[in-house]
Regions:
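A glycine- and Lys/Arg-enriched "phosphate-lid" helix/loop adjacent to the NTP-binding pocket
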Residues: 87-159
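NTP-dependent small-molecule kinase module
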Residues: 134-203
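Conserved lysine of the Walker
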Residues: 13
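Hydrophobic anchor at the beta1->P-loop junction of P-loop NTPases
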Residues: 5
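Post-Walker A alpha-helix
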Residues: 16-17
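Glycine-rich phosphate-binding loop used to anchor ATP phosphates in small-molecule kinases
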Residues: 48, 52-118
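Conserved substrate/cofactor phosphate-moiety recognition/catalytic segment
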Residues: 22-59
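P-loop (Walker A) phosphate-binding loop of NTP-binding proteins
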Residues: 8
């Protein structure tokens, strides 16, 4: 069972990944954060946006190929290659930080790559309102996230909703984090596991 977990910054992807990997005795695959372009990007976003996103895309492709070649029965991936393209690269393009030519090139590479790797058996989407995201970001206390702009989170939420409702074509499990706090109520994890197994059993 290959399960990928998607959602905005602060939605609880890493926490859910950790919980599910313990439940299934599986290995977790987390987002690559060591990007050599990150410092340059924050100093000059429009100059380095394309290189930043291409590096993340390449890292995600390699991670996906490597993890699927292990033959492990259960695999859980924190954030997906689809979010790189449809959420973050698209947002940089819409903000004018990535040129249309660079974005078109990026999407060609993305489309070629995703045609060569399988979709997750189930994509879990953690839907969360801005107040929930902000609360969880503050609770985990990462210094570089403490002043994150709520307008930025809102734009990303809009892109996530559009992607989930209009673009993504695989099997999907949506969890409303405003209602289902699986940290406060562990019984919700039992329900999520049952839903995962039901969905993967479907032909």
């Amino acid at each position: 069972m290959y399960v990928a977990i998607a959602g905005n910054i602060g939605s609880g992807k890493t926490t859910l990944t950790e919980i599910l990997t313990k439940r299934y005795g599986a290995k977790a695959y987390y987002e690559e954060t060591d990007n050599p372009y990150l410092g340059d990007f924050y100093n000059d976003m429009s100059r380095w946006a394309f290189q930043l996103q291409i590096f993340f895309l390449g890292s995600r492709i390699k991670q996906t190929v490597d993890m699927l070649s292990t033959g492990d029965e259960n695999i859980f991936q924190d954030r997906t290659i689809y979010e790189d393209a449809h959420i973050f690269a698209d947002n940089l393009h819409k903000m004018g930080l990535m040129t249309s030519r660079d974005f078109a090139t990026y999407m060609k590479i993305f489309e070629l790559s995703t045609n060569l790797i399988p979709k997750p058996d189930v994509l879990i989407y953690l839907r969360a309102s801005i107040p929930t995201l902000v609360s969880q970001i503050k609770r985990r206390g990462r210094e570089y996230e403490m002043n994150i702009d709520e307008g930025y989170l809102s734009r990303l939420n809009e892109k996530y909703e559009y992607w989930i409702n209009n673009i993504y074509e695989g099997k999907l499990l949506v969890i409303d984090k405003d209602v289902d706090d699986f940290v406060a109520d562990p019984s919700i994890i039992d329900r999520i596991c049952s839903q995962l197994e039901e969905i993967t059993a479907q032909k």
